[in-house]
Amino acid sequence: MKNKLYQALLLIFLVAGISSCDYLDIVPDERPTEEDAFKDKNAAERYLYSCYAFMPKEREGCYLYQGGDCLTDYDRKFLEGTHTAANIGDFAYWSRMYAGIRRCYTLINNVDAVPRMEEELKIIYKAEANFLIAYYHFMLLRAYGPIIIMDHEVSVSSTEKLKRSPFDVCVKWIADKYDEACNNGLLAVQSSSYYGRATQLAAKALKARLYLYAASPLFNGNSFYANSSLYDPETNEPLMPLDYNCLLYTSDAA
């Protein structure tokens, strides 16, 4: 009986001793930090490319529909009407696009501190990041309508309460963001070594597409939204334009 008591006490002391050790809580030295991402020119370039990594493909998810129905439960959700903006798999952009937006702001806020990096290159990187911020907001707008505009970097631990902006406000903000990129360092043409990176032509083309979508009857005066829940919870003002305007954005597009 005494031996069992001694064994129990010994076990308690051992567990207490192990739990008090903090040598397992040390962050590994090789784990990258934000400072590592901007420690030199090459690291900054890698970080810029990581900002592009959030771009979705226009055909994303299409290969799922080339297989049998047994491969996915998408068809079942469609038939049952249980699809929502949050559970559409490869087509759910919300978290992914906002993660990309935050990364772009991180680059903008830190690239100036990169040592031995040409000032002109820093300006180009920030312009490309602004282009991506506009593009990611556009993808969100296309998928969800009125969205939360992120005009600054928000900490992952932030408790800031954010709300959706009216559709026309979102459109103007995105268009202005494309203009900001074009007017502040975005290259007219990229060299063949940087094929696929943002250019002024891409920004202007996407701005035109933004206006095309916004002026279409899908978003412009669609009566479907009159009875929806797309209203500002504080002012009770509609977030979607309820009256059709055939001249909407014509002066801006010109």
Where are these regions (language model features)?
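A solvent-exposed, charged loop/short amphipathic helix patch at secondary-structure junctions
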Residues: 222-247
